[in-house]
Design a protein with these regions (language model features):
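Axial heme c-ligation environment in periplasmic c-type cytochrome domains
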Residues: 124, 130-185, 299-302, 333-348
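C-terminal accessory segments of extracellular proteins
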Residues: 326-373
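An amphipathic alpha-helix signature
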Residues: 143, 164, 174, 192, ...
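Aromatic- and histidine-enriched alpha-helix N-cap/loop-to-helix transition segments
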Residues: 13, 119, 186, 190, ...
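Non-catalytic, well-ordered alpha-helical scaffold segments
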Residues: 122, 140, 161, 189-193, ...
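Post-cleavage N-terminal segment of exported redox proteins
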Residues: 2-70, 166-225, 229, 242-250, ...
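Short glycine/threonine-rich turn/loop motifs
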Residues: 40-148, 212-315, 319-322, 328-334, ...
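Short amphipathic alpha-helical interaction segments
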Residues: 3-6, 10, 291, 309, ...
């Protein structure tokens, strides 16, 4: 059965060689696919290569694609409170590089440092490789997501329009903008594009798992290998967390990003458990199927991004696995009618859960940050 299928060996010994052969055949046939026209980089020799997906596909038109100058400018803006209304908060206040671009809190504080916001801070690693931003998928590209955060009264209470004037007065910023955008004066969009370019540079696709699947068989131990096969099979994790990004970007084209209804509890209290009252995607798309629906986040760097779920309700991966093993909200008797997570229990043993967690920890890769900071 598929539960016993050795998916890892199948990928390394059969899928990768076949994929490489297909790429070479296309090249030999003289078939050219221009960059940016597809999410898939058809020059990559494996679906697990670092450049297997094209970041430009998820970007604005070509004149706003990522360049080294824009990354440098975006990195400076990312850590500068100049965009916030009271000049005390930057993007890095919540998306902290040393915490895999999260903040380690169940939910972040608002600008007043007293009010608690409604959702957990997600990692920014690989955030550029998706067509939906925010847990409720209300923004499409990073530029639009960034504008919402800057203008949100509780988050930054700023104004990109007002920031233009501030940035024009700064000699260093003027130089950086001239190098990054030599044909345009400083404006709202290129501020957002610069920060988005920096975020698009935050690739995390060279973890131990990736190195193993590209041929370095020393990178995974027996428990981690078993964990991957369980992840793909019996545990059904990969039916929502699609490879190679391990998020909701749907193969084979990776042009849509899925959301799921899990029945996440409001707190860890089980006597009785309460369904979290955040309606998720339904707040923006008034269809009952989207009630309590949230975007499937990436599992890459998962060991660094606790606490978990859209509301930060679970502190450990063990708690997360227990929730899924029992059928999500159904197992807590709080499942909404539209729960998309299968109601049946997974019947994973404690050993199997440990193996899955061991595998997930092989998805840790912060080399991009080390190179930037």
């Amino acid at each position: 059965s598929f539960n016993e299928f050795d998916t890892l060996t199948f990928i390394t010994d059969y899928v990768n060689p076949f994929y490489k052969c297909l790429v070479q055949t296309r090249i030999n046939s003289g078939i050219d696919i221009p960059s940016g026209t597809s999410a898939i980089n058809y020059n990559a020799t494996s679906p697990f290569d670092e450049d297997a997906l094209s970041i430009n596909f998820y970007s604005p038109p070509e004149e706003y694609w990522v360049t080294p100058e824009r990354i440098l400018l975006g990195k400076k803006l990312f850590s500068d409170p100049i965009l916030s209304g009271n000049k005390t908060r930057s993007c890095a206040s919540c998306h902290q590089p040393e915490k895999a671009f999260t903040d380690g809190l169940p939910k972040p504080f608002a600008l007043d440092n007293k009010t608690v916001l409604t959702r957990n801070t997600p990692t920014l690693y690989n955030a550029g490789f998706q067509t939906s931003q925010f847990f409720d998928s209300r923004a499409d590209i990073l530029e639009n997501q960034l504008g919402e955060v800057v203008h949100n009264i509780q988050e930054m209470s700023g104004s990109l329009h007002k920031s233009v004037a501030d940035l024009k007065k700064d000699v260093l910023y003027k130089q950086l903008f001239d190098r990054a955008y030599p044909k345009e004066p400083i404006n709202n969009f290129i501020i957002a594009n610069a920060i988005s370019s920096y975020i698009r540079s935050l690739h995390s696709l060279n973890a131990r798992f990736d190195q193993y699947i590209r041929g370095d068989k020393k990178q995974l131990n027996a428990a981690e290998k078993k964990g991957f096969n369980l992840f793909m099979g019996k545990a059904k994790c990969a039916t929502c967390h699609f490879i190679p990004l391990f998020n909701g970007a749907v193969p084979p084209l990776y042009t849509t990003t899925e959301s799921e209804v899990l029945g996440v509890p409001k707190t860890k209290n089980k006597n009785p458990a309460q369904l979290d009252d955040d309606l998720g995607k339904y707040l923006f798309i008034k269809s009952d199927v989207y009630k309590h629906s949230f975007k499937t986040p990436t599992l890459r760097n998962i060991e660094l991004t606790a606490p978990y779920m859209h509301n930060g309700v679970f502190d450990t991966l063990e708690e997360v696995m227990e929730f899924y093993n029992n059928g999500g909200g159904k197992g807590l008797h709080i499942a909404p009618e539209n729960q998309t997570l299968p109601f049946d229990q997974l019947d994973l043993s404690k050993k199997e859960i440990r193996e899955i967690i061991a595998f997930m920890k092989t998805l840790t890769d912060t080399t991009t940050t080390k190179n930037l900071y």
